[in-house]
A protein has these predicted regions:
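A short, well-structured alpha-helical segment
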Residues: 68-72
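Short, exposed beta-strand "edge-strand" segments with a Pro/Gly-rich flavor and a Y/T-containing core
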Residues: 2-3, 53-56
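A short interface-forming secondary-structure element
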Residues: 39, 55-67
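Residue-level signature of catalytic and energy-coupling elements of molecular machines
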Residues: 14, 50, 74
């Protein structure tokens, strides 16, 4: 019969993991990533918590005859910034979640 994990030890590990997750989530509020589109004509800065902090548009990108192009560049830059921020969050929060593997709980696939 496999050795059962110590309940007190498991609770301490869960509490430690919760603390690490809270710290990582707080840090994501201040960490920023940047993405651009149109060769840098549109740039978006976003936090790891998915709050857009800045959108910069090069004046050369503004063509009243081609508003659709500008809209497409803004959309592409925002979507790329979101993807980058999500990758950052996965990296930061994944480290905090690593503690689950050490709990030895059967059935969690960890």
């Amino acid at each position: 019969m496999p050795k059962q994990p110590n309940l007190n030890q498991m609770m301490r590990q869960v509490q430690q993991m919760q603390d690490e997750m809270a710290k990582a989530q707080e840090a994501l509020k201040t960490e920023e990533v940047e993405a651009s589109a149109g060769g840098g004509m549109v740039t978006v800065k976003i936090t790891g918590a998915l709050e857009i902090k800045e959108i910069r548009i090069d004046p050369d990108a503004v063509d009243p005859e081609d508003v659709d192009m500008l809209q497409d560049m803004v959309l592409a830059a925002v979507n790329e910034a979101i993807r980058s921020a999500q990758e950052l969050a996965e990296k930061r929060l994944g480290g905090a979640m690593g503690g689950l593997q050490n709990l030895g709980l059967p059935g969690l696939g960890l």
